[in-house]
Amino acid sequence: MVRMMIRRLSSQASRFVQPRLLETGTLRIALINCPNELLFCCERGFSTFSDRNLSYRDKLSSGLVGIKADDAVDLFRDMIQSRPLPTVIDFNRLFSAIAKTKQYELVLALCKQMESKGIAHSIYTLSIMINCFCRCRKLSYAFSTMGKIMKLGYEPDTVIFNTLLNGLCLECRVSEALELVDRMVEMGHKPTLITLNTLVNGLCLNGKVSDAVVLIDRMVETGFQPNEVTYGPVLNVMCKSGQTALAMELLRKMEERNIKLDAVKYSIIIDGLCKDGSLDNAFNLFNEMEIKGFKADIITYNTLIGGFCNAGRWDDGAKLLRDMIKRKISPNVVTFSVLIDSFVKEGKLREADQLLKEMMQRGIAPNTITYNSLIDGFCKENRLEEAIQMVDLMISKGCDPDIMTFNILINGYCKANRIDDGLELFREMSLRGVIANTVTYNTLVQGFCQSGKLEVAKKLFQEMVSRRVRPDIVSYKILLDGLCDNGELEKALEIFGKIEKSKMELDIGIYMIIIHGMCNASKVDDAWDLFCSLPLKGVKLDARAYNIMISELCRKDSLSKADILFRKMTEEGHAPDELTYNILIRAHLGDDDATTAAELIEEMKSSGFPADVSTVKMVINMLSSGELDKSFLDMLSTTRASLK
C-alpha cells in the first residue's frame, strides 16, 4: 500500500505549491513567498541577530537554539547572498534549528527558496521537510516528498518512516500507520523503540488503550524492551477514562519489567484515583511512592489536596498542606485556592479567610479563582457587604474582577431580593469592559421573573438576543417559567413553538414547565395531551415527570386520570417513590375515598416509604373532625413518619 501511495504521490514532489503562511507572520516572513528581487531589497536593520560584522558561518556557529522567525529569515538571506553559496549542510543546520522552534511553515518556505536558487535538496533536507509536512497535517505532501527521495535513488531510513508514522498517528490514521510498519519491515528496516512509542501514542490518542497494551506485550515477547516513554500515554489515557484499576496493574507490570518510574507516573495514577473517588487508594499510593524514594512534588500534593477537598474532606486536605510545608515544599496559588474553595463550600468562611491571609503572608498572590470562591461564599450567606469588600480588596491587589465575579455578585443580589442592585452592577460591568454572558442574563431574567417584574425580564431577554449572546436551554426554561407563573401562557406557547421548530435539543424539564403552565391556566386536558405525546417526540419520561403530572391532575380534580397515570408509571418501569404515594393518598382522602387511600398506604409501606408530614397532618385533622377513625392513624404510624 505504501509503495502505491509513494508512486501515486511522487509526481507531486517536483511541483508542490508551498501553502500560504499563517496570517499572523511578520512582513519579513510574508516576503518569503514574494519574488526574489523583493525579498532581497528588504530593509534588514531591525533584527539584533543581523549583525553586519558577522558572516553567516559565525552566526551558524554562534548557536541557533530558539531562533526567532525574523532572525532566521535574515540569516537565510545572508546565506543566499554569499558567494560562493553555502553547502546544503549549512542550510540544513538552519532548517533543523527553525523546525525545533515549531515554525514548520517557515522551514518549508525557505526550502522552496533554496531549491529555486539552484541548491539541490539532500536526503536530510527532504527528511526535515517530511517532518514539517507531518506537523502541519499535510500528509499528502509528506508522502509526495518520500516519493521524491526514492526517485532520486535514496533509500528512506527508519527516521523517515517513524516521522511518517507520527504524522499518520497525529491524524488518527492508526490502521494506516500499522500497515506502514509492515511495509517498513518488508523493505528491510527493523522497527526501533521510537517506532513502538509512536504507535503506542497513536493508539492511545485514538482511545485504543487495550490495543496499545497488547502491542507492548507482543514487543516484549519478541525481546523488545519498552521504556518509561512507552508507558506514559497508556497510563494517561487509562486514568483519564476512569480505568485506574488497569493503571495500577500496569504500574506493577512496569515494576516487574524494571521500567524507570518517577514521581510523574505516580502522580498520574494518584490523580486518576482521586477523580474516581478512591481517595484512600490514592493516599496509599502516595505513601508507597515516598517509601520507594520518589519525592512528591507540588503537583502530587495539589492533586491529593484537590481530591480530598472535592470529596468534602477539607480537614485531610488541610493536613496535607501542613505536611508539605513541613517538608519544605512551598504551596502555590493552586494549593491555597483549592483549600479555600473547599472551606467555603463547607460554610467555613472564617477558616477560608484565615487561609487567604496566610497565603498573602507567604507572598503568594491570590488569583481571580481564589477571590471568586470567597465572594461566592459571602453571597451565599447573604453577607453582601463583605462580598463587596472582598471585591475592593481584589482590585486593590491588582486582580481585576472577571465575568465570574460579576455573575456571582449579581446572583447574590438576586437571591437577596435586591434585583435593582443586581441590574445596576450589570450596567457597571459593560463600563469596565466585561462582557455579559448567558449566565449573567439568565440570572437577571430569573430574578426579575421571580419578583414579578416580567416586563423588565422580557426586555433583558430581548437585549440578550440583540447583543448576540446565545440563549441556552436554561434561558428558555427561565423565561417560559416566568411567563407561565405570571399568567402569560399564550406568549409562553408562542415562544415554545418556535423553540420546538429550532435545532435546540429539548429535555423533559422544559416540557414540564409548559405542562405546569397549562394546568395553572385550567387547561388540564391540553396538559394531559402534551404529556401523553412526549414519548412520540422521543422525550424520555422519568419519575419526577410522572410525579409532576400526577400532582397537577390531583390539584385540578382529575383524580381518575391521576390513578391511570400512576398504574401506567409502574407498567413503564418507573417505580413510584415517596412523593408519588403521598400525593395520591392526600388526593383520595380529600375526595372522601378512605378505602383507596388505605390501599395506597399499605402499598407504600410494602415499598419501604414513609408518610410525609403533610399526609400525617391531614390525617390528624380528619381524625379531629371525625372524618376518619383512629385505626387509620395506627396504620400510618407504622410507616415511620415523624409527627414532629
From Swiss-Prot:
Keywords: Mitochondrion, Repeat, Transit peptide
PROSITE patterns, per the entry: PPR (PS51375)
Residue spans of the PPR repeats: 87-121, 122-156, 157-191, 192-226, 227-261, 262-296, 297-331, 332-366, 367-401, 402-436, 437-471, 472-506, 507-541, 542-576, 577-611
GO CC terms in record: mitochondrion
Transit peptide, residues from-to: 1-53
Subcellular location: Mitochondrion
Database matches in Pfam families: PPR, PPR_1, PPR_2
Signal peptide (from-to): none
InterPro entries, per database record: Pentatricopeptide_rpt, TPR-like_helical_dom_sf
Family assignment from sequence similarity: Belongs to the PPR family. P subfamily.
Protein name (record): Pentatricopeptide repeat-containing protein At1g12775, mitochondrial
Species per Swiss-Prot/TrEMBL record: Arabidopsis thaliana
Lineage: Eukaryota, Viridiplantae, Streptophyta, Embryophyta, Tracheophyta
